[in-house]
Amino acid sequence: MKKLLVKELIEQFQDCVNLIDGHTNTSNVIRVPGLKRVVFEMLGLFSSQIGSVAILGKREFGFLSQKTLVEQQQILHNLLKLNPPAIILTKSFTDPTVLLQVNQTYQVPILKTDFFSTELSFTVETYINEQFATVAQIHGVLLEVFGVGVLLTGRSGIGKSECALDLINKNHLFVGDDAIEIYRLGNRLFGRAQEVAKKFMEIRGLGIINVERFYGLQITKQRTEIQLMVNLLSLEKQTTVTFERLGTELKKQRLLGVDLSFYEIPISPGRKTSEIIESAVIDFKLKHSGYNSALDFIENQKAILKRKKDES
């Protein structure tokens, strides 16, 4: 079973999350992803243990503010006795005095942040969900081209890294080379480099290079959403693959249960593979915006044939 310690969460967000109580229990285990709103638990309607981090924000503070001191204490006892691994107080939860008093019995780690609930969802909750996500490892290179996460695949030695280097020289962003960790959040896939290989790339004939040192911090990225998969194939060695000639529809490749848009690009000496990949990304974006070059071409041909027929 995957797990995350509260102290690991605190360390990850030490610049924006402060531990204000429960210092002895930061080894508590977070067993469930996400952040949990706990109004029903505060009302005593649920009695099962809480495995995820609880969040108290504007809604919960407003609810407590309408109660007497004794009622507030009982409500907070209802929550704390369910032993959540930690509780995060948002910026809107402005007065934790009663909570800290009741927590003397339970010593649940209480974290305070200047984030609102929405900001916590995009930062802390996303991080927690990533730790619990199913992770697959795939051999390839991950970049961000024109804002689109592109996973380059292909057999070893076909030139993925060299193609990626060309794209980096065109100011596209580098995420990782060789062993890419891919994880699913909802119906979206994200990718990152393995920790040991982060920032590094192997170029045959040159060796290992540190992309961040060579090209600067601005050219690297920690992770990206994978929207497009491009498989490089040797044109000389392919006898079974029928390559797309018109491109009326986007192919799909399933990865971790998510269908990714997929291109197969033949490579051979003299072909500018990096420019073809840039064109593939533009084609992908245009198709998603509703424009299809192949269909436009077909309609144009039909119009020409019709005009010639009418003239004859």
UniProtKB/Swiss-Prot annotation:
Q: How is its activity regulated?
A: Contrary to HPrK/P of B.subtilis and other bacteria, that of M.pneumoniae is active as a kinase at very low ATP concentrations in the absence of fructose 1,6-bisphosphate (FBP). Kinase activity is slightly activated by FBP, and inhibited by inorganic phosphate (Pi), but FBP prevents kinase inhibition by Pi. Dephosphorylation of P-Ser-HPr by M.pneumoniae HPrK/P is strictly dependent on the presence of Pi, and is inhibited by FBP.
Q: EC annotation?
A: 2.7.11.-, 2.7.4.-
GO MF entry, a single one: ATP binding
**Phenotype when changing residue 140 to A:** Kinase activity not affected and 6-fold increase in phosphorylase activity
> Which top EC class applies here?
transferase
Q: Which InterPro entries match?
A: HPr(Ser)_kin/Pase, Hpr_kin/Pase_C, Hpr_kin/Pase_Hpr_N, P-loop_NTPase, Ser_kin/Pase_Hpr-like_N_sf
As its record notes, the protein acts as a catalyst of:
[HPr protein]-L-serine + ATP = [HPr protein]-O-phospho-L-serine + ADP + H(+); [HPr protein]-O-phospho-L-serine + phosphate + H(+) = [HPr protein]-L-serine + diphosphate
**What would changing residue 207 to A do, according to UniProt?**
Loss of both kinase and phosphorylase activities; ATP binding not affected
**Amino-acid positions noted as binding Mg(2+) in the UniProt annotation, renumbered to this chain:** 161, 202
Q: Where is this region: Important for the catalytic mechanism of dephosphorylation?
A: 266-271
The record lists the effect of residue 157 to A as: 4-fold reduction in kinase activity and strongly reduced phosphorylase activity
Q: What is the effect of changing residue 160 to A?
A: Loss of both kinase and phosphorylase activities; no ATP binding
What effect on the protein does mutating residue 161 to T have, as reported in its record? 2-fold reduction in kinase activity and strongly reduced phosphorylase activity; binds ATP with high affinity
Query: What is the documented function of this protein?
Result: Is a metabolite-sensitive enzyme that catalyzes the ATP-as well as probably the pyrophosphate-dependent phosphorylation of Ser-47 in HPr, a phosphocarrier protein of the phosphoenolpyruvate-dependent sugar phosphotransferase system (PTS). HprK/P also catalyzes the pyrophosphate-producing, inorganic phosphate-dependent dephosphorylation (phosphorolysis) of seryl-phosphorylated HPr (P-Ser-HPr). The regulatory role of HPrK/P in the physiology of M.pneumoniae is not known yet.
Assembly and interactions? Homohexamer, arranged as bilayered trimers.
Instruction: Tell me the protein's name.
Output: HPr kinase/phosphorylase
The organism's taxonomy opens as: Bacteria, Bacillati, Mycoplasmatota, Mycoplasmoidales, Mycoplasmoidaceae
